[in-house]
Amino acid sequence: MIVSKTSKDLKSVLMVGVKDIVKYPYYLIKEKEQVIFVVSPGRNGIEFNKTLGYFSNFPGMQTYQCLYGSGILVMQRNDEKAQAKEFKVVTLNATKVVLVPASWGMCLVNTGNNFLVVLRNSILDQKDKNRKPILEKRGFAYYIVEKKGEISFEQNPNYLLHPQITTE
């Protein structure tokens, strides 16, 4: 099954005031026990195109493997008040495999000029995905943006805390 996400689906997690939005930000290809994310290239204003993201209620680790393109996998762990406690970014290139721990939030960001294609090893039921903190705060603690041709991080003003960004 193929699901296409539209600019309307993504608007609630983008920086406030964004006008130019990628029409079809990403697609999901679901089959048996896996999902392929196909994230379109482009920008939503100055923010790189991304997936909506979610916090995982899945009891185990999830494996993400980049099949094509380049981008960033964002991971965030919140405290009990839904404030960011840890923020980690992992650079994605073809064949890169990333494990996302239980209870962490994740989002895929396409920083390249081609599609970003990423495989997840599990199909999650709606009960396994918690989007509420992301929707309430319009995204994760930082937005991934382009400034002067470089990848940069802009603080999301809806968070009180902005932890140090760690990379992998």
Question: Where would I find each of the regions flagged by the language model?
Answer:
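Histidine-centered metal-chelating micro-motifs
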Residues: 96-98, 102-107
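Active-site region of the double-stranded beta-helix
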Residues: 1-91, 109-168
